[in-house]
């Protein structure tokens, strides 16, 4: 488990996009990478939060620079898993619902994402899920969907109190298809906006599946949070 850290002097030896890793000046980092609405929200302003079904909240979090640079880092590192159940990265060596993905700790972005969850995502979660408190992060990674590789994900519940998903590229331009179907609610979530975050309850109520990506490559961040 990853718990909250107050350390903001975080750097990485990644070869590209070093500024994304450097959160030593948090205000400068926010200026570079947060969506303008979320920056306004941090300063006491308003933010657009959509709730299309009960307890699913979508809001603008990152700008497109963040999304593009993170995709570039993931492809430069090229540490994608094979999408099989056996996974040596996990303590028990087994993933029940595997995806083709790269964990943030594989690219040196785990501490940064930890800070993003506690500083930004948790602020929205604790407004939407009244009475909840974000205490730790179970796992965080970027998933890659392609027609020739893993193109969808079977129905499942997440191993989390709540989960966060962030779209990193554009439906209709970078890929076709995709999205998430919440089965019990009979609702398909098809965001087209890179940098928008969706949060929803994990292990109990929001049974869901990843819909087929039929063209191009779809990238999303997934984070399981307690």
What are these model-predicted stretches?
Residues 11, 19, 47-52, 87-94, ...:
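Homeobox/homeodomain signature
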Residues 114-226:
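Catalytic core of non-heme Fe(II) oxygenases with the double-stranded beta-helix
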Residues 9, 19, 36-39, 60, ...:
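Short non-domain terminal segments
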Residues 13, 22-25, 40, 82, ...:
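Acidic-enriched, low-complexity/disordered segments with a strong bias for Aspartate over Glutamate
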Residues 34-133:
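Non-heme Fe(II)/2-oxoglutarate
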Residues 1-57:
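Fe(II)/2-oxoglutarate
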């Amino acid at each position: 488990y990853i718990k909250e850290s107050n350390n903001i002097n975080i750097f990485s030896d990644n070869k590209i996009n070093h500024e994304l890793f450097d959160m030593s000046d948090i205000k400068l980092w926010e200026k570079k990478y947060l969506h303008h609405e979320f920056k306004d929200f941090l300063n006491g302003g308003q933010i657009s939060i959509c709730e299309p079904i009960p307890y699913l909240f979508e809001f603008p979090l990152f700008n497109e620079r963040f999304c593009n640079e993170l995709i570039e880092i993931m492809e430069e590192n090229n540490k994608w898993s094979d999408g099989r159940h056996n996974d040596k990265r996990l303590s028990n060596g087994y993933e029940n619902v595997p995806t083709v993905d790269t964990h943030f700790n594989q690219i040196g972005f785990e501490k940064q994402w930890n800070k993003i969850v506690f500083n930004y995502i948790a602020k929205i979660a604790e407004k939407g899920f009244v009475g909840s408190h974000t205490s730790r992060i179970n796992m965080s990674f970027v998933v890659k969907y392609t027609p020739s590789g893993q193109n969808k994900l079977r129905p499942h519940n997440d191993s989390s109190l709540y989960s966060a998903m962030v779209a990193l590229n554009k439906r209709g331009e970078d890929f076709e298809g995709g999205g998430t179907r919440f089965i019990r609610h009979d609702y398909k979530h098809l965001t087209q906006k890179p940098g928008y975050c969706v949060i929803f309850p994990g292990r109990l109520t929001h049974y869901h599946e990843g819909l087929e990506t039929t063209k191009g490559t779809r990238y999303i961040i997934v984070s399981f949070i307690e």
